[in-house]
Amino acid sequence: MIVPSFTFCSTVNALMWNGLEPVFADVDPRTYCIDVEDARGLITPRTVGIAAVHTFGLPADIEPLETLAREHDLKLVFDAAHGLGGRYRDSALGAFGDASVFSLSGTKIVTSGEGGLVTFRDPADAERFTFLRAYGFKADYNCRYIGLNGKLSELNAALGWLSLDLLEPVLAHRHTQVQRYRQALSDCLDLTWQAVPSDCIHGYKDLAVLFREPGQRAAAEAALSAEGVMTKRYFFPVHRMDVYQKFARRALPVTDWLHERLLCIPLYSDLPDARIDAVAQLIRASSNRASAQQEAAGILRCA
């Protein structure tokens, strides 16, 4: 099954638990989502499907992916763990593909503590899933499928249900916070942001800054850490992980390039404006220093 390496490991773990071998695709350097044309080149008679990811909450290139899947009679599954609140052409992200899997874990903008949601195109798949999540049976205790205990507890379900009411206001607030970051760093030419196509609404589970050079990322990370600001280098490419290196059969230059330069910065509901401004100032100052150091080093090498 074709899947991006630039994702959280659980995307690929799920394929392996179902006996599917991952074939790693590269991602688009602007959106960080799966590169449709790269995926096209990986299709063989053994390919059964594509697992695409809505990276950081940005919808993947859905229409071309659905067209590609139809052309080759492939299943299309979306890892929508970051996708609650995101929209593609005015539709919620659960409306696409054969299935979409959303996370409600504690790091998401809507949470049930743990657990998630699954949407299906085919009602028969949805019905089968109700068996699979509860040992494979219903009230009669007659197993029709080999299931597992994947039920959400009543407490977690209640928390998630109540949290859904917060989705729209929380997402609107996050968009305001992101805009404040972008405005504060608009004069920093060594930084770029994840591109958001005009027909998409970003879910902003995470906010990633792309630095021109790895040294600038390292400098910003160190400066922020010194002030007690948590950041993360996200994602660590799956094809580089110990357990998945045997499936790394080709170079993924964009994935590796992003891995060396992206840094996720603070984004949460009660993040004060003053802290956004302070984080932005630290990033700007550290990036400028790193650029000056790299320029000087280049001059010395050429002298």
Regions found by a protein language model. Give the residues of each.
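Structural detector of well-ordered beta-strand residues that form the stable sheet scaffold
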Residues: 2, 23, 76-77, 101, ...
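Conserved active-site segment immediately N-terminal to the catalytic lysine
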Residues: 78-110, 127, 139-144
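Nucleotide-sugar-dependent glycosyltransferase donor-binding/catalytic pocket residues
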Residues: 8, 32, 57-58, 109-112, ...
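PLP-dependent aminotransferase class I/II
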Residues: 37, 49-53, 62-64, 87, ...
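Histidine-centered beta-alpha loop that forms part of the nucleotide-sugar donor binding/catalytic region
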Residues: 6, 20, 27, 54, ...
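Short secondary-structure boundary/capping segments
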Residues: 14, 41, 91-93, 101, ...
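Short beta-strand-to-turn element immediately C-terminal to the catalytic PLP-Schiff-base lysine
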Residues: 102-103, 116-122, 161
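PLP-dependent aminotransferase-like
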Residues: 2-80
